[in-house]
From Swiss-Prot:
Active site: D66
Enzyme Commission (EC) number: 3.1.26.11
CDD domains: RNaseZ_ZiPD-like_MBL-fold (cd07717)
Binding site for Zn(2+) 1: H62, H64, H142, D212
Residues engaged in binding Zn(2+) 2: D66, H67, D212, H270
Keywords: Endonuclease, Hydrolase, Metal-binding, Nuclease, tRNA processing, Zinc
Cofactor info, note text: Binds 2 Zn(2+) ions.
The reaction(s) this protein catalyses: Endonucleolytic cleavage of RNA, removing extra 3' nucleotides from tRNA precursor, generating 3' termini of tRNAs. A 3'-hydroxy group is left at the tRNA terminus and a 5'-phosphoryl group is left at the trailer molecule
Family of this protein: Belongs to the RNase Z family.
MF terms in GO: 3'-tRNA processing endoribonuclease activity; zinc ion binding
EC category name: hydrolase
Protein name as it appears in the record: Ribonuclease Z
Listed SUPFAM superfamilies: Metallo-hydrolase/oxidoreductase
Source organism of this protein record: Cytophaga hutchinsonii (strain ATCC 33406 / DSM 1761 / CIP 103989 / NBRC 15051 / NCIMB 9469 / D465)
Gene encoding the protein: rnz
Amino acid sequence: MDFELFILGSSSATPSKGRYQSAQLLKIHNDYFMIDCGEAAQYQLSRYKLNHTKISHIFISHLHGDHFFGLVGLLSTMNLYGRKNPIHVFGPPGLDEIIQIQLKYSETLLQFPLHYTTLENEGSEHILDHPLVDVYTIPLEHRIRCNGFLFKEKPKSYKLNKSKLPEDLSLLEIAQLKQGIDVYDENGNVKALVREICMPALKSRSYAYCSDTKVNEQYFPYIKGVDLLYHESTFLDELADRAAKTYHTTAKQAAQVAKEAEAGKLIIGHFSSRYYDTEPFLLEASSIFKHTYLGTEGSSFYVSDRISHEDNS
């Protein structure tokens, strides 16, 4: 099953040449999940031939404009293209009011259901139980309320070795084996053991999106062992003091977070427009965390191929 991340925008507060404001698209099988929606989001979707009609859920981290100013424009375009399927938006208090005011005064009547979930909990919470994935918030520390998001693939079924499968098992008992549960008869006698019949289930994959934040160890437990981690890195370490004052992170700090969290791979982004060249970010971070990648426009990453923690040392 596909589990692929597309980077649509990598700039911070203001866009710069070739770089746009925060927006990502996570493809899980045939479902599209959008994470933040900066001004150029719908343009970037079109540019990279990512079909906006497949987007079913949109997650907004916080109410700084570079993370949501493209949302109403995208919803309006979906409407113009005749969308009928519902869309689910998750975001902080106030975003639903902003959306409704913009739609009201532009006299836009959506022809599809828009469901809004307000994220008010200051701790981590389970916000979406989807057939393919569970989504949790990651409480971050920014100048205003801000959440990251953790996407965890649903546990995978065990695979059966059919040559070892007893012939007298019912479909219900076979389903039980696939869930990793041994099968016994009504007298408690063993009919089938998982360890003898099943091959180990593949590990479920995970992706964590850490938007604007200063480093705070309180969110580390929520990203522990994640396969793919996106962490903002607005500044290089030479501006660590400014990063702290503005509640942002440096490339060096992002790498230290990934190392502490024992992540598989790290993507860095949200680069300040003061930097034309992003290569120094990669050099700074990869000196601490080997498997670091620049999350620049048009890049994509598969959430798979787990890298061991030791290999990142």
